Amino acid sequence: MATAEIEEIPALLKPGQTVAGLDLGTKTIGLAVSDLGLSFAHPRPVIKRVKFTIDAQVLLKALETDKVGVIVIGLPMNMDGTAGPRVQATRAFVRTMQPLTDLPFVFWDERLSTVAAERALIGMDVSRGKRADRIDSAAAAFILQGALDRLHMMRRNDYDAG
């Protein structure tokens, strides 16, 4: 499967699978993984980018280890809602990954995710040096948590309507 919509995630997951969040940078790939209840995003170590084949291999191994069934990837939109300069690179990354995995990708607007992640790390009194190492995975967790919160709201609305 190529890409999916956020609303499709529950139907795509098999029992025991999690959801991953990715923050794609030029030097690193931030990674976060949900719990089985799809309530909380947990940052994982960043993946240092080398070249695509190595990056993909490391990423796919991490996704397999965490029993990931769906990947939510941040789409770097501009504040006015238009596609930012990194949107094309993100879409190209997904297109290049698709032949390597059956996992579906869900694009998620990541506006201000890095800013929010940095503020959270500052709030936790993480030193500047350690923040640089953790920012991309913290941003991935922020992206994934936004998607998980949306899923939770959808379930709640379905429950209230039923």
UniProtKB/Swiss-Prot annotation:
GO-annotated biological processes: rRNA 5'-end processing
Taxonomic lineage from the root: Bacteria, Pseudomonadati, Pseudomonadota, Alphaproteobacteria, Hyphomicrobiales
UniProt keyword list: Cytoplasm, Hydrolase, Nuclease, Ribosome biogenesis
Pfam families: RuvX
Record-given protein name: Putative pre-16S rRNA nuclease
Its biological purpose: Could be a nuclease involved in processing of the 5'-end of pre-16S rRNA.
GO molecular function: nuclease activity
Name of the top EC class for this enzyme: hydrolase
Domain of life per record: Bacteria
InterPro entries named in the record: RNaseH-like_sf, YqgF, YqgF/RNaseH-like_dom, YqgF/RNaseH-like_dom_sf
